[in-house]
């Protein structure tokens, strides 16, 4: 037998042994229902003598039914280990659950389809507004009369204009007196 086949047979045998060795006792999980500020726990097992609830190993008085309703649930104060067990004796059959939940008063539950619909509609509306503004600005640009900039507005005609001489230097930047040395006149003069 090849080593590859040997490993496959060995793996299959281990898988079968693991499946046969599994515990047949089925554990029923707690049912937790959150609505607004209230949390409802359902004990996974029915006890004949009645049920008692414990939170952090302290008995909760007045809660003897299969359902435990926690009104005004607070994440900080109400979180902890919850147990439901038989009223008399038989503490071995206790089921323990660690509960930490966030609740809010005005929350609304939405499913995946509703969220996807909201996102797609938002994208479509945004693209529609974008196209509307684009075509509106394009049509406005076509209706506008072209404006030519005059020479006094800082614009020069493009290309060479042989009839116009070069502009006169601006007298604002000329030295005030020819022989006077200004504060910054000595900067960057290496050849002097």
UniProtKB/Swiss-Prot annotation:
GO biological process annotation, one example: positive thymic T cell selection
Taxonomic superkingdom: Eukaryota
User: Which PROSITE patterns does its entry note?
Assistant: ITAM_1
The Ig-like domain extends over 27-98
- Presence of the UniProt keyword Transmembrane helix in the record: yes
Q: Do you know which Gene3D superfamilies this protein is assigned to?
A: Immunoglobulins (2.60.40.10)
Signal peptide from the UniProt entry: 1-21
Give the protein's recorded name: T-cell surface glycoprotein CD3 epsilon chain
Residue ranges that the UniProt entry lists as topological domain Extracellular = 22-111
In which organism is this protein found? Answer: Ovis aries
Which residues, renumbered to this chain, carry the PTM Phosphotyrosine? 173, 184
* CDD domains reported in the protein's UniProt record: IgC1_CD3_epsilon
Q: Name one Pfam family in it.
A: ITAM
- SUPFAM superfamilies registered for this protein in UniProt: Immunoglobulin
Instruction: Give me the ranges of the annotated region Proline-rich sequence.
Output: 164-171
Sorted alphabetically, which keywords does the UniProt record give? Adaptive immunity, Cell membrane, Disulfide bond, Immunity, Immunoglobulin domain, Membrane, Phosphoprotein, Receptor, Signal, Transmembrane, Transmembrane helix
Q: Where are the transmembrane segments?
A: 112-137
Q: Where is the ITAM domain?
A: 163-190
Please name the GO terms that the record assigns under molecular function: transmembrane signaling receptor activity
Cysteine disulfide partners in this protein = 43-84
């Amino acid at each position: 037998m090849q080593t590859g086949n040997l490993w496959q047979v060995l793996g299959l045998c281990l898988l079968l042994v693991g499946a046969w060795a599994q515990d047949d006792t089925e554990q029923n999980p707690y049912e937790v229902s959150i609505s607004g500020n209230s949390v409802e726990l359902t004990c996974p097992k029915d006890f004949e003598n009645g049920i008692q609830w414990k939170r952090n190993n302290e008995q909760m008085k007045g809660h003897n039914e299969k359902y435990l309703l926690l009104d005004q649930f607070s994440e900080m104060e109400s979180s902890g280990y919850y147990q439901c067990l038989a009223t008399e004796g038989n503490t071995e059959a206790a089921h323990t659950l660690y509960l930490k939940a966030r609740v809010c008063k005005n929350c609304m539950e939405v499913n995946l389809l509703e969220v996807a619909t909201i996102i797609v509609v938002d994208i479509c509306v945004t693209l529609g507004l974008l196209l509307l503004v684009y075509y509106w600005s394009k049509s406005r640009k076509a209706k506008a009369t072209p404006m030519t900039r005059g020479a006094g507005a800082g614009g020069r005609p493009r290309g060479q204009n042989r009839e116009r001489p070069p502009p006169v230097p601006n007298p604002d930047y000329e030295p005030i007196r020819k022989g006077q040395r200004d504060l910054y006149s000595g900067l960057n003069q290496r050849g002097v």
